[in-house]
Curated annotation (Swiss-Prot):
Origin organism lineage: Bacteria, Pseudomonadati, Pseudomonadota, Gammaproteobacteria, Enterobacterales
Cofactor(s) needed for function: FAD
InterPro entries: FAD-bd_OxRdtase (IPR050260), FAD/NAD-bd_sf (IPR036188), FAD/NAD-binding_dom (IPR023753), NO_rdtase_NorW (IPR023961), Rbx-bd (IPR041364)
TM helices/strands, residue ranges: none
Pathway as given in its UniProt record: Nitrogen metabolism; nitric oxide reduction
Catalyzed reactions: 2 reduced [nitric oxide reductase rubredoxin domain] + NAD(+) + H(+) = 2 oxidized [nitric oxide reductase rubredoxin domain] + NADH
Pfam families the record matches: Pyr_redox_2, Rbx_binding
Gene: norW
The EC number(s) this enzyme carries: 1.18.1.-
Species: Enterobacter sp. (strain 638)
Keyword Oxidoreductase included in the entry's annotation: yes
Main location: cytoplasm
UniProt keywords, alphabetically: Cytoplasm, FAD, Flavoprotein, NAD, Oxidoreductase
Protein name per UniProt: Nitric oxide reductase FlRd-NAD(+) reductase
Length: 377
C-alpha cells in the first residue's frame, strides 16, 4: 500500500507544492498537517493591513475545506507534529500518526523576538494567526514602535504611518535596510520615511519594556526612553528546524537540503522559509515558487537539480517602492546612481565594469527586467 506524500505545513510553500504535484499526478495520496487553520492567505498582505483597515479574517482567500476538495487531499488542521521517526517513515502527533513514502517539511520560520526585559510585551506580525491575536490592540494604538529596520520593519513603519499613527523605528544599525543595500542607495527611502514623520532611532539599542498606566515605556541606551502603546518586533525570521533535528536531519541556518531539496535523511525534503539552499535561506515568494516546481518533479520520480535564476526582491513601501537584484550587499562594488524626481537607478559595478547588482525605485522600476537580464547568471 502506498502511503504517498506527507507535507508538514500549510503556507505558501506547501500550497505551491500541492498545486505542482496535482498538475502531474491526480492520484498520489497527499496529506497535509499543520498547527493552524490551514486557510489560505497572502502573507505579504500583512505589511499593509493597518493602512488598508483589514481584519485578519479579511485576508482569507480560500478555506482549508475548499483547498482539500479542489486538490483531493487529506488535511489535519490545528495538529502539532511532535516527532518524526525517519527509520520507520512515520510522523507523530499527540494522538495520531501517519506513515509516508516521502515527507516534506514546509514548517516556515517564526519571528525572532529579542530577549530583553519585558520582551513578552512585543507583538509579532508573521502570520494571519498572529495578526488575529493582536489586531484590536494594533488598530487602537496611536503610538507604535517598530523594532528592526530591515525589509519587514521598514514596510510596517510606512504602513502604520500611512494609517495616521505616530511611529518610532528602532535599529542598532546606522541606517535602514543595512543588510540589503549600501547607505547611498537606502538613503532615499530613509529620507522619505523622515518626511512622512517616522521617528528613526538608528544606532540605538532597545534595552527594556515596562508596562505603565498609559501604555509601555521603552528604555533605550544612552538613558533615553519613549512612551508608546504597542511594540512590534521585526528583527528577522528564525527557520523552524526542530522537527528536522528530531528526524536526524542536518540543520544550520535552516534545514540543509541538496540540489534536489532532500535533507540529509532519505525521503525527507524541505521547502520554503525553513530550507537552507546552498548556505542561504531565501524567504521570498519567487524562489519558493520555483523550488516547489522542481520538488514536485523529484517527489514523483524524476531527478532534476534545482536551478534558481537571479531574482527580483520587492520592497513594498508604496510611498517609495523599490526593486533590487544581484549582490546588493557586496562591499566592493562601485555604485553608479542616477537620481531624478521620478525615481532612482543604482547600478553596482565590479572592478571589471560588470554589473553585479542594481536597485530601482518608483517610476524607474520598469527598467528592472532589462537590468536583470544584464546580471551574470
Amino acid at each position: 500500500m502506498s502511503h504517498g506524500i506527507v507535507i508538514i505545513g500549510s503556507g505558501f510553500a506547501a500550497r505551491q507544492l500541492v498545486k505542482n504535484i496535482r498538475k502531474q499526478d491526480a492520484n498520489v495520496p497527499l496529506t497535509l498537517i499543520a498547527a493552524d487553520s490551514m486557510d489560505e492567505y497572502n502573507k505579504p498582505d500583512l505589511s499593509h493591513v493597518i493602512s488598508q483597515s483589514q481584519r485578519a479574517d479579511d485576508l482569507t482567500r480560500q478555506t482549508a475545506g475548499e483547498f482539500a476538495e479542489q486538490f483531493h487531499l487529506r488535511l489535519f488542521p490545528y495538529t502539532r507534529v511532535t516527532d518524526i521517526d525517519a527509520a520507520a517513515h512515520c510522523v507523530k502527533a499527540k494522538d495520531k500518526q501517519w506513515h509516508y513514502d516521502k515527507l516534506v517539511l514546509a514548517t516556515g520560520a517564526s519571528a525572532f523576538v529579542p530577549l530583553i526585559e519585558g520582551h513578552e510585551l512585543m507583538l509579532t506580525l508573521n502570520s494571519q494567526q498572529e495578526y488575529k491575536a493582536c489586531e484590536t490592540r494594533l488598530r487602537d494604538a496611536q503610538r507604535v514602535m517598530i523594532v528592526g529596520g530591515g525589509l519587514i520593519g521598514t514596510e510596517l513603519a510606512m504602513d502604520f504611518c500611512r494609517a495616521g499613527k505616530s511611529v518610532t523605528l528602532v535599529d542598532h544599525a546606522a541606517r535602514i535596510l543595512s543588510a540589503l543595500m549600501p547607505a547611498e542607495v537606502s538613503s532615499r527611502l530613509q529620507h522619505r520615511l523622515t518626511d512622512m514623520g517616522v521617528h528613526q532611532l538608528l544606532k540605538s539599542q532597545l534595552q527594556s519594556l515596562t508596562k505603565t498606566d498609559t501604555g509601555i515605556r521603552a528604555t533605550l541606551d544612552r538613558n533615553r526612553s519613549v512612551e508608546i502603546d504597542v511594540v512590534v518586533a521585526a528583527t528577522g525570521l528564525r527557520p523552524e528546524t526542530a522537527l528536522a533535528r528530531r528526524a536526524g536531519a542536518e540543520t544550520h541556518l535552516g534545514v540543509k537540503v541538496d540540489s534536489y531539496l532532500q535533507t540529509t535523511q532519505p525521503d525527507i525534503y524541505a521547502l520554503g522559509d525553513c530550507a537552507e539552499i546552498n548556505g542561504q535561506v531565501l524567504p521570498f515568494l519567487q524562489p519558493i515558487q520555483i523550488s516547489a516546481m522542481y520538488l514536485a518533479k523529484n517527489l514523483l520520480g524524476t531527478s532534476t537539480p534545482l536551478k534558481l535564476p537571479t531574482m527580483l526582491v520587492k520592497v513594498k513601501t508604496p510611498e517609495l517602492p523599490l526593486h533590487l537584484a544581484g549582490e546588493t550587499q557586496r562591499q566592493d562594488l562601485n555604485w553608479q546612481i542616477t537620481l531624478e524626481t521620478q525615481g532612482m537607478v543604482a547600478r553596482g559595478m565590479d572592478n571589471d565594469g560588470q554589473l553585479r547588482a542594481f536597485v530601482v525605485s518608483e517610476d524607474r522600476m520598469k527598467e528592472a527586467f532589462a537590468l536583470l537580464k544584464s546580471l551574470p547568471v
